[in-house]
Amino acid sequence: MSVESKKADDFCLCPKFEKTFGILGKKWNGLILEVLLAEGDQRFTDLVQKIPQCSDRVLVERLKELEKDGLIEKVYMRDCARGFYRLTRCGEDLKKIMKEIHSWSEKWILETDKN
């Protein structure tokens, strides 16, 4: 057995790491979390305005998934049928990670047209 195939056979991704990247790497999730981290609680309409490239249908799906994963929660106010979304403690813990991603992207990602 060669050194390369032995190394490949010995390597195994951590299931928790895989799940984390499955959540954070899903299109729009990072942007949704970034808006909530940067600007706090948001109504659905606020998120629609701040992430205009994401369709309403997909945004609803992502919000439900992030809620199921424990990163955000939907809070309903007594006097209003519509609620707002906010980060849970778990979601708030991403602040440092997102700051590091910002630093990395400033250093390595070239600005391109938004088209």
What kind of region is each of these model predictions?
Residues S2-S5, C14, R86-N115:
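Amphipathic alpha-helical dimerization/coiled-coil segments
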Residues F11, P15-V58, R78-R86:
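N-terminal helix-turn-helix DNA-binding core of bacterial DNA-binding proteins
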Residues G25-K26, G40, G70, G91, ...:
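Glycine-centered flexibility sites
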Residues E34, E67, H102:
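A cross-family signal for key residues in well-ordered alpha-helices
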Residues L59, L63-L66:
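Basic amphipathic alpha-helical segments that dock to polyanions
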Residues E67-M77:
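A short, conserved structural fragment
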